[in-house]
Structures are given as C-alpha cells and as structure tokens.
C-alpha cells in the first residue's frame, strides 16, 4: 500500500489487488500485533503525508536494551539529546487505517478488495492480471507484494533459498504497572528472543507493551493452551521486574518463524518487494522496515525513469532497483539470522562470551553508533524518500 501511495503521488496510475477485506483488517481493538517503524521509515511516511495522522498514535522508542537471559550486563542503545528517537511503535491496525485513508484520497489508485489474481501474463510491452471476478487489468509493471507465500513470485518461477527455524513467535498485549519509559527490551534465551515493545498508554492511562516471545515449535501449542494465570507467570519469569505487575491486554496468537531469500527480485516487467522477496527473523524488528526500504527504492527508480521517458517496467528501471536493494536486503537477512544463531547457543560459556562481547560494544562508542544507525535504517545510500523531510 505504501508503494502504491508513493507511485500515485508521483503521477503513476496504480491498481491494488488485495485478497482481504479492509473492514476486517481495521477492526476495532488492540490485538497485540504491533510494528516498529524505524527512523528512515518514519521519514518515508513524512514524505507521503502519513506522519501527521500517525504521530499521535505511536510510542517513541527512546532506547533499546539488550540482555542475555536477565544475567548481569546489557547494552543500551540510546541516541544523544536532540537526535530524536530510535523509531516508533504502532499497533498494526493504526498503520492500516492511515494507509487506507491516504490511499482513498489518491485518484490514481484503483482498489480491488477481496479479490485474487487467477492468471498473470507478462510480455515485452506490458502485463495483464485476471481477477477472480473476471476483470482483466493491464499495466506496464507487475509488483509482487503478497508476502512470504507470494503466488506472483511462484508463478514467475523465481528460486528461493529458505529454511524453517522450527520456532514460533507468541504475540500478546500486556498491561503493566511500571511505565516502560520508551525502552524496547530484547532479552535473549537459548530457545529464542523475548521482546517487550513499548506501546502508548490506553485511554485510561494504563501502561501497555507488546510481547513477542519466541518458543520452540514443539512448545508453542502448550504455551497457547496455558491458562492466563500460568502464561503470565511464565512471562514474569522471563522479564523479571522490568515492567512490574502485568496483565493480559490482548489475546495470545502465534506465527511460524522462517527465513527465505530470493535469487533475484526482478524479472521481465516484474518486481518483488517486502516479504515476497525476503523473509527474516523478527529478532531486530526489521522485517517491515526492510520492505519499506524496498518500496522507497522502487518508487525512486520508477519516478526517475519516468522523467527520462522510460515506462515503469523498463528493464533499465528494474535493473537499477535490483542493484540497489539486493545487497542491503541480503546483509540484513544474514545479520538477523546470525544473531538468532549466536544467542541460541546454550551453556554458561557461550553466555559469558556473549556478555563480554556486549560489554565491549557498550564501551565502544563508534561501534554502538554503527548498530544504532543500522537499527534506524539510516546507513548506506538511501532513497530520497528515506531522508529527513
């Protein structure tokens, strides 16, 4: 949707085909599902006119604290005064509402909700997509943005490297006694990371955080079946006194964790963005931001090409997009996979080595700055839409 809004604002005509019903995606209530929006992604929202609507809905991330199993020692990433936050946390519903509202105001966007593409054709001069209701759409470029199981990617025969972590992420919303102070906690255990992400207080002033707890696949069903009392006891044991007394603010849910990376992200008049191109572990909260970087780069490649008289699906436009995004996406994917494996090594010796390493990072300002820039998405050659407004 972000890609469609950016292209429409640049003057392109866009069809958006969505198999889901917008009403279901924006249903009332906090379900615990939330996303971290990095500094660079927030800049993108600013350029697209989304920031004024979203700003009061998000909780700034003032710092990120990293700890190994509640043992002594941690790394705290906190920007200098005047540098702003490390990002913002939003309930996914708030992001969807803002995107749907912005898209509805764009006359260049044709919306096809509750629809699926049943046939795709690509050729030297254009593409077509036949919808489930028989409608045939024609364009110059086809973009696959349907997520990890992208049928557009599969239809194009693009090879994918993938593996299953055999873990699931348990998602829940927590209400808690202590204010979170804008700190996002990443507590690592051999079974997987345990993240506490700061959310806005509710209308009554109740402090809230989103929980993302990684558990082994074999244990996930048992965790989901626990009574609320037993589940909260397990959560307290994992988080210590970080947030004080806790209660459930939203029901539990889960999703499987896996890695995949495509051999290429373009083909004839085809581009892949987001999870259709690369799926990573949520360990650093970079999945959505990686997709937004794809969108910003593709918008710039297409709009620059249009100014030169090239159509959006021109091979030169797509080659530039692939050169720009392939290495960054691969590096982020490998880094998150490496962190997952590093902190998954059990034993006291491994824990000691990790804590010594964290202590070293804590003392080395240039290295801490590099990690913070990566988390904020402001390193490397950025699309103009990711630069400050």
Please state what every model-predicted region is:
Residues 3-12, 44:
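A short, Lys/Arg-enriched amphipathic alpha-helix followed by its capping loop at the start of a domain
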Residues 8-33:
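Glycine-rich FAD pyrophosphate-binding loop
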Residues 16-17, 144, 273, 280:
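Generic enzyme active-site microenvironment
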Residues 43-47, 54-155, 163-168:
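Conserved N-terminal helical subregion
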Residues 300-389:
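C-terminal helical "tail/cap" subdomain of flavin- and related membrane-associated enzymes
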């Amino acid at each position: 949707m972000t890609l469609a809004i950016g292209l429409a604002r640049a003057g392109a005509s866009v069809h958006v085909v969505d198999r889901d019903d917008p009403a279901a995606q924006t249903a009332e209530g906090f379900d615990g599902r939330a996303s971290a929006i990095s500094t660079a992604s927030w800049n993108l929202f600013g350029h697209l006119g989304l920031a004024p609507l979203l700003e009061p809905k998000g909780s700034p991330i003032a710092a990120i604290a990293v700890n190994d199993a509640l043992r002594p020692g941690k790394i705290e990433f906190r920007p200098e005064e005047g540098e702003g936050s490390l990002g913002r946390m939003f309930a996914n519903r708030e992001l969807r509402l803002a995107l749907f509202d912005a898209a509805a105001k764009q006359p260049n966007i044709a919306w096809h909700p509750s629809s699926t593409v049943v046939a795709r054709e690509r050729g030297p001069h254009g593409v077509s997509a036949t919808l489930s209701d028989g409608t045939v759409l024609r364009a110059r470029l086809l973009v696959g943005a349907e997520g990890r199981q992208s049928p557009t990617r599969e239809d194009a025969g693009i090879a994918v490297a993938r593996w299953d972590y055999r873990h699931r992420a348990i998602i829940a919303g927590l209400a808690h006694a202590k204010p979170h102070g804008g700190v996002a906690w990443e507590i690592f255990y051999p079974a997987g990371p345990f993240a506490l992400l700061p959310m806005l207080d509710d209308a009554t002033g109740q402090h809230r955080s989103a929980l993302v707890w990684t558990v082994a696949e074999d244990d996930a069903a048992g965790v989901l079946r626990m009574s609320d009392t037993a589940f909260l006891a397990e959560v307290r044991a994992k988080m210590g006194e970080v947030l004080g007394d806790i209660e459930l603010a939203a029901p539990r849910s889960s999703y499987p964790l896996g890695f995949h990376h495509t051999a290429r992200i373009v083909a004839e008049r085809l581009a892949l963005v987001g999870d259709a191109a690369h799926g990573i572990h949520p360990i650093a909260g970079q999945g959505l931001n990686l997709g937004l970087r794809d969108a910003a780069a593709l918008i710039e490649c297409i709009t620059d090409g249009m100014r030169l008289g090239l159509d959006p699906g021109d091979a030169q436009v797509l080659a530039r997009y692939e050169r720009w995004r392939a290495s960054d996406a691969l590096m982020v994917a490998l880094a998150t996979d490496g962190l997952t494996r590093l902190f998954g090594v059990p034993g006291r010796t491994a824990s000691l080595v990790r804590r010594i390493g964290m202590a070293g990072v804590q003392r080395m300002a240039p290295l801490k700055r590099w990690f913070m820039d990566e988390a904020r998405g402001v390193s490397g050659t950025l699309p103009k839409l990711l630069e400050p407004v």
